[in-house]
Amino acid sequence: MYNTDIVIIGSGPVGLFAVFQAGMLGMKCHVIDAQEVIGGQCITLYPEKHIYDIPAYPKITAKELIEQLKSQAAPFNPVYHLNQQAIELNKHNDFFEIKTSKNTIIKSKVIIIAAGAGAFGPNKPPLANIEDFEGKSIFYFINDKSKFLGKNIVVAGGGDSAVDWTIALSEIANKIYLVHRRDKFTAATESIRQLRHIAETGKIELVTGYQLNNLDGHNNELQAVIVKDLQNNIRKLDANILLPFFGLKQDLGPLANWGLNVKLQHIEVDNYYYQTNIKGIYAIGDVAHYVGKLKLIITGFAEAAHSINHAYSRVFDGKALHFEYSTNKYEQKQ
């Protein structure tokens, strides 16, 4: 059994920043993550994707952001329990006891849930024999964009992932078709502006008003993607790669059975300290829900700071926290 001050569930950017914030206040952390590596969705789904709304970074890849956050938290020696889920919660007086899928038991006074989308998987389009092409011609996540050099690509979807990856891959692909059932996209305004600008050059073709209908290929290699509009007009797009981006299926898994207030796979918290209905358990980042919630990494960073500062008095039995600027606190830790 391990004893610590705080258990953080999730090692994405918000969870890692919570480790740093806790360390600055002298609190030790153990981190549980179901993935084999630190970084959450940033590493598992889009390590090479650029992020543009992190302060002081005009752009930074998801992988670079995680590396920076790991380095920032490293001086406080967090203990990581990877490739295992938090499955069981018990409470003993003022302490929580968590058991993982690998029978690891951790005792702490505070739990911070920063689980992002929880256990996630792609929403797959209902296409016949799609599994024959998965992993060779059809991909739901991009870990290495260099494999798409010179390819003819169909990207399907209208949200941030579809638009952002269309823009990013246009630099290396031979041709990209972006297929969306509507004329309007739901991505960031600036991303849509960039998309339409590149489309004017002919590098990207916007195939709007169409949906995926069928696949054409043999020996697990795609040769064309068939799309159809509402009037049943058919187009055959010559392509050897299909990237469907229709969002993720979210599943809180065992966390949903912990007695927390859960709504639509999100954990409800107050909008002051991001504490759940169980005192001592907080939820931050994309997994948390409250009125006015904004799903941004920077919002999760602020939630981490608030929740960790509020948790201080619980960890140290009611001791008051006296505010200090990070310059002074960090120098004292070194």
From Swiss-Prot:
Top-level class of the enzyme under EC nomenclature: oxidoreductase
Binding site for FAD: 33, 41, 46, 86, 120, 286, 327
One MF term in the entry's GO annotations: ferredoxin-NADP+ reductase activity
Keyword Flavoprotein: yes
Family to which the UniProt record says this protein belongs: Belongs to the ferredoxin--NADP reductase type 2 family.
Protein known as: Ferredoxin--NADP reductase
SUPFAM superfamilies given in the database record: FAD/NAD(P)-binding domain
Lineage: Bacteria, Pseudomonadati, Pseudomonadota, Alphaproteobacteria, Rickettsiales
Subunit and partners: Homodimer.
Keywords: FAD, Flavoprotein, NADP, Oxidoreductase
Domain of life (superkingdom): Bacteria
Cofactor: FAD
UniProt-listed Pfam families: Pyr_redox_2
InterPro entries in UniProt: FAD/NAD-bd_sf, FAD/NAD-binding_dom, Fd--NADP_Rdtase_type_2, Ferredoxin-NADP_redctase_2
Native species: Rickettsia typhi (strain ATCC VR-144 / Wilmington)
Catalytic activity reported: 2 reduced [2Fe-2S]-[ferredoxin] + NADP(+) + H(+) = 2 oxidized [2Fe-2S]-[ferredoxin] + NADPH
Cofactor binding comment, as recorded: Binds 1 FAD per subunit.
Leader sequence residues: none
EC number: 1.18.1.2
